[in-house]
Amino acid sequence: MQRNLTQSKEALLKSYNSRLKEDIRSMRENFEEIIRLAKGENDTQLSKITQCEQDTYETQVRAANIVRAGESLMKLVSDIKQYLILNDFHSVNEAICSNSTLYRTTQIDRDNKLMAVRDDMAADLYDLEEEYYTSIYK
């Protein structure tokens, strides 16, 4: 069962990684092609108006591809957050246990300090009472 869970996590992480690389590659390639089209140094047999329309259409398609890849990246981030929130009980339990241990240690330390202050105050109060009752100025 544990092995299947580990393999499932590995497969999911590989899937996330491949989606990330694919979307970034798509954004980069489309951006490079838009820049190439912006240079406008194509010597073709098409008329300038036809070439301009073709370049405009290709730029719009590539811009739409960049937007699609960006939306896919946002979905990927959302999926990763959801996965971590819903499935990462081990780290949540570790954090709770470590905080609990820290708070217990702090509580014990404070209790010891309070007891030391109590004992010092009791000893000082005893000394003051003894001094008061043995004083000639009462």
Swiss-Prot record:
Component of the Mediator complex, a coactivator involved in the regulated transcription of nearly all RNA polymerase II-dependent genes. Mediator functions as a bridge to convey information from gene-specific regulatory proteins to the basal RNA polymerase II transcription machinery. Mediator is recruited to promoters by direct interactions with regulatory proteins and serves as a scaffold for the assembly of a functional preinitiation complex with RNA polymerase II and the general transcription factors. Signal peptide: none annotated. The gene is MED22. GO terms for molecular function: transcription coregulator activity. GO terms for cellular component: mediator complex. It is found in: Nucleus. Residues 13-40 form a coiled coil. GO terms for biological process: regulation of transcription by RNA polymerase II. This is Mediator of RNA polymerase II transcription subunit 22. Belongs to the Mediator complex subunit 22 family. InterPro entries: Med22. Keywords: Activator, Coiled coil, Nucleus, Transcription, Transcription regulation. The lineage of its organism: Eukaryota, Metazoa, Ecdysozoa, Arthropoda, Hexapoda. Component of the Mediator complex. It holds the Pfam family Med22. It comes from Anopheles gambiae.
